[in-house]
Amino acid sequence: MSTIKEYLSELSGRRVTVIGMGVSNIPLIKLLLRAGVEVTVRDRSSRERLAGQAQELESLGARLILGEDYLKDLPEELIFRTPGLRPDNPELLDAVQRGAALSSEMEVFFQTCPGRLIGVTGSDGKTTTTTIIAEFLKEAGKNVYVGGNIGRPLLADVADMVEEDY
């Protein structure tokens, strides 16, 4: 495990692309840009649909590739894919064959989170179970961060987390 600062330092000078401008990838994109990483953001949506979000990321230094051909020619060395894009996508497989590495916002979080992680999986009851676990831990005086499909993307908070956190 490395700290988020160490992880970002390792990306210095590398060409990175983030596929998808959804809720979970926006904190990743901003974190990379603030660290001085050269970031290309790719999304199937049009500029009109992304409006202010596209402008904000460009003002922070991101290069945007939008529209139907957003996955054409992936020359970057590291590709962060959105959870909605299958890892066996032909364009991704081509990029990997050329030497690109695949990652995700959650993978970065798992690699850099100093706290204790609790995963909840299953078909039904995940939100309820997660909420109950969080409340039990809070009642015990623990500092708790809740992520996944409830709460907010945790990568934005990882720099503030310590080993005792959940």
Residue positions per predicted region:
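N-terminal leader/targeting and accessory segments in enzymes
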Residues: 1-104, 108
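Phosphate-binding loop of NTP-binding sites
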Residues: 72-74, 83-166
